[in-house]
Structure formats: structure tokens, C-alpha cells
């Protein structure tokens, strides 16, 4: 079994480091990261990500979506363009991503922008339902609101609540709906006690691994762009929190990811 990095912005990692895409993928493969999901944050990413993944279809797949952090930039027409892109998608497109809600940034919490966030999230959930695709969800200080949307709009393919940070009870509600929990760099920090306890208690078949590269640096690499190969650090941290053998953890997190995004 291998590693599947279920959440990256590989296009931005390449832009940030200036390294050839082939080198980024080789580095990942040396750490046994055989599959990488590249997710969009705005409409301008769509073509870049499609072209990038077409070069390495055995290792890369992608998701198209409109991220809540960029809600001020998103136009209503972007939802139309997203629908068109999903309708014309190739087989490398395996998710609607990255979508979600954001309440950690005060500037995005005006009544107008919060309503727009909710509208874009709901619209993209319906697109995922329409095209029978899973979702990869951003949730920051919005677990209750996200849960309400997911319960109201059931999807056939479900998906992942990515980069989870929160309590066991919050995570368990998503798991009970059938969603997976994205485990990333947060658990490499001992101070993230609540999240570490949650990940330790959840069923292993509810977990997938991710890096969110170039974001969410793991402990020991603060201040550096995160990379798919550093999924190994999150895996090691996960193994210290779980009672299962490391090989079983690797096997099931791989299979869980493939079940959703392959």
C-alpha cells in the first residue's frame, strides 16, 4: 500500500518554489506518495490544474471548486463556469473542491459576504450531487454550519472534511453522515490536544491523510512550504495516536482515499 495525499494546492507549491512539476512528483514518490489530489480555490485555477494533472495522470487527480477565502473575488458567473467545467470534465477530475465555509477572518463575516459564502457552498454541493462527485470541504470555525448543509443536501459520493481541527463530537457527527476526516499537519503539534484526541478515537475507516501543501506546515518544518512527501510526518504522528499496527493504518488510509477519489 501507498500514501494518497488527499488535499494539495500543487500548482501554488510549484509557483512558490519554482521547481519543475516532475521534481515535485519524484520527491513525493520517493516517500511512497503515489496519488495526489490537486484542488482549486478559484476559477482561474481550473485550466492550470487540468493541464498539470494531464501530464501525470497516474499520480495526479484534481478537484474543481470555489474556496470561501476568495469569496470577495468570486462572481456568480464563476458558478456557471464551474458547472461547465464539471460537465466537460475528464477522468482525472474526481472531486468538487475546495469548497466550504470560513468564519475565522472577520472581513468575510459581513452579512452580505456570509450570505454569499452560504450561497456558493450550497450551489457547489448541488453541483457535486448533479455530477455524482465527492466534495473536499474547508471548515474553519464552521463545523455546525457545515454539518447543517451536509445533512440537508445528501450526496451520493460524500467526501472529506479536510484539515480537521476540532473535538471528537464534532468529527463524529460528520463521520455518522458518512464523511471522512482529513488528517494533516495539525496532529504533529502536541498542543493540538483536542484534535489529537479526536483522531485517536475515530474509527480508522473514517480517516484519510493529507498535507494541504504548500499550507499547513508540519511540526519541525514551520516557515517552509509544505510538500506532499511530508505526509509521512503526519502518518508517523497518527501511528503514535492509534493502537493499530502502522501497516494497517497505511493500508486503510490509502484504501479510504481511493474509495472516495479514484
From Swiss-Prot:
KW Cytoplasm (keyword) present: no
Protein keywords: Hydrolase, Metal-binding
Cofactor list: a divalent metal cation
TM helices/strands, residue ranges: none
Superkingdom in the source lineage: Bacteria
Molecular function as annotated in GO: hydrolase activity, acting on ester bonds; metal ion binding
SUPFAM superfamilies (alphabetical): Metallo-dependent hydrolases
Cofactor mode of binding and number, as noted: Binds 2 divalent metal cations per subunit.
Record Pfam families: TatD_DNase (PF01026)
Entry binding sites for a divalent metal cation 1: 7, 9, 98, 212
Binding site for a divalent metal cation 2: 98, 138, 162
Family in the record: Belongs to the metallo-dependent hydrolases superfamily. TatD-type hydrolase family.
PANTHER family the UniProt entry points to: D-AMINOACYL-TRNA DEACYLASE, HYDROLASE
Name this protein carries in UniProt: Uncharacterized metal-dependent hydrolase HI_0081
